Amino acid sequence: MSMSDPIADMLTRIRNAQMVEKAVVLVPSSKVKVAIAQVLKDEGYIDGFSVKANDGKPQLEIALKYYAGRPVIERIERVSRPGLRVYKGHGAIPQVMNGLGVAIVTTPQGVMTDRKARATGTGGEVLCYVA
């Protein structure tokens, strides 16, 4: 059976792995998931990631990051979902925790943070909030 929301599955796997203090988590790979992982790495929420072929099916291996024994990601939640897409113009993209967190947005220029989307004047679909 196919997954109805693969991005929510990825975020849930990250959240669950951090609750049990795993070093890495494996997620089925896709271009959007790799782009989300790149944004998380650029913002310092994860240590790194790599795509590995596992029996012909690519797997995204995400190295989780901890500080003083606590997960760096305190909150990660899906915003736009298959049943209710959330699109925002560049002026309406929300700030997460007054700028302490990030909203990950997919735009015509690719997947980026809310700050970069506002700076480039581009709106798009708000995928998730990370803090």
Swiss-Prot record:
Cited PROSITE patterns: RIBOSOMAL_S8
Pfam families: Ribosomal_S8 (PF00410)
CC terms in the record's Gene Ontology section: ribonucleoprotein complex; ribosome
InterPro entries per UniProt: Ribosomal_uS8 (IPR000630), Ribosomal_uS8_CS (IPR047863), Ribosomal_uS8_sf (IPR035987)
Keyword Secreted: no
Entry's Gene Ontology BP terms: translation
MF term (GO), any: rRNA binding
Origin: domain of life: Bacteria
Alphabetical UniProt keywords: Ribonucleoprotein, Ribosomal protein, RNA-binding, rRNA-binding
Function: One of the primary rRNA binding proteins, it binds directly to 16S rRNA central domain where it helps coordinate assembly of the platform of the 30S subunit.
Family to which this protein belongs: Belongs to the universal ribosomal protein uS8 family.
HAMAP family per the UniProt record, alphabetical: Ribosomal_uS8_B
Assembly with partners or alone: Part of the 30S ribosomal subunit. Contacts proteins S5 and S12.
Protein's name according to its UniProt entry: Small ribosomal subunit protein uS8
